[in-house]
């Protein structure tokens, strides 16, 4: 699996997912929160606030924690969100796109980095989502030999570092392990993302609609990606 091929699929799927959940114009007034690329401070607010309204049908989301993985696995790692519709239309859309592209060679599975989100979904909806350790244990138990991990993180922040450290502990259990880079890594990545979001939002360029892309930021030096995108 070539890195650029995976990058392209990640970017296109990610932009498509954002558009499916609304851009803030009259064409779609519903708003969702996609926390898959954020840092930990969002956990408590999301888990507490959503109890006041319906977040969608959890049963429609494929948690991708099934066994019978095979020898090759593509593990898609996200921060996670407990908003059911948002999880299905954003994180799920990225996973579905990767499965469509690489299903001949890899089984696609899911792992979330936010344990608070995982616990909240389990308590509220009785839906089980693997954390990173559980996802890696599942890969080992299923005899996976080649493990490719693609995070949906926006930048090389604290969570990406923690992911890399956790994966390193399991490296000896596989014949080959590869971890994809975050969305914004090289100058070429920035150009690709800017073109993708411009193309995806061009129908809203009517001189009246403002589109704002938001992120929670990070304490890591990689927070500079926001200024660079501006």
Show the residue positions of the predicted features.
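Active-site-proximal alpha-helix that buttresses catalytic centers in soluble enzyme cores
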Residues: 24-230
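Bacterial N-terminal signal peptides that target proteins for export
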Residues: 2-10
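Alpha-helical transmembrane segments
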Residues: 13-17
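C-terminal motif of bacterial Sec signal peptides marking the signal peptidase cleavage site
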Residues: 18-22
């Amino acid at each position: 699996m070539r890195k650029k091929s995976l990058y392209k699929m990640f970017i296109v799927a990610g932009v498509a997912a954002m558009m499916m959940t609304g851009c803030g114009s009259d064409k779609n007034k519903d708003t969702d929160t996609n926390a898959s690329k954020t840092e930990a401070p969002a956990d408590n607010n999301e888990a507490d606030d959503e109890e006041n309204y319906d977040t969608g049908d959890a049963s429609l989301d494929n948690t991708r924690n099934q066994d019978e993985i095979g020898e090759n696995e593509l593990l898609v790692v996200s921060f996670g969100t407990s908003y059911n519709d948002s999880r299905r239309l954003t994180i799920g859309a990225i996973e579905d796109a990767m499965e469509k592209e690489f299903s001949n060679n890899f089984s696609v599975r899911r792992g979330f980095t936010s344990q608070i989100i995982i616990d909240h979904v389990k308590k509220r909806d009785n839906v089980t989502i693997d954390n990173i350790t559980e996802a890696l244990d599942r890969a080992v138990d299923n005899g996976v030999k080649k493990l490719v991990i693609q995070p949906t993180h926006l930048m090389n922040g604290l969570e990406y570092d923690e992911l890399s450290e956790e994966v390193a502990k399991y490296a000896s259990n596989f014949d080959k392990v590869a971890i994809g880079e975050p969305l914004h890594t090289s100058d070429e990545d920035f150009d690709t993302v800017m073109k993708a979001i411009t193309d995806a939002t061009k129908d809203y360029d009517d001189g009246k609609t403002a589109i704002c892309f938001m992120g929670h930021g990070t304490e890591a030096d990689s927070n500079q990606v926001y200024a660079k995108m501006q």
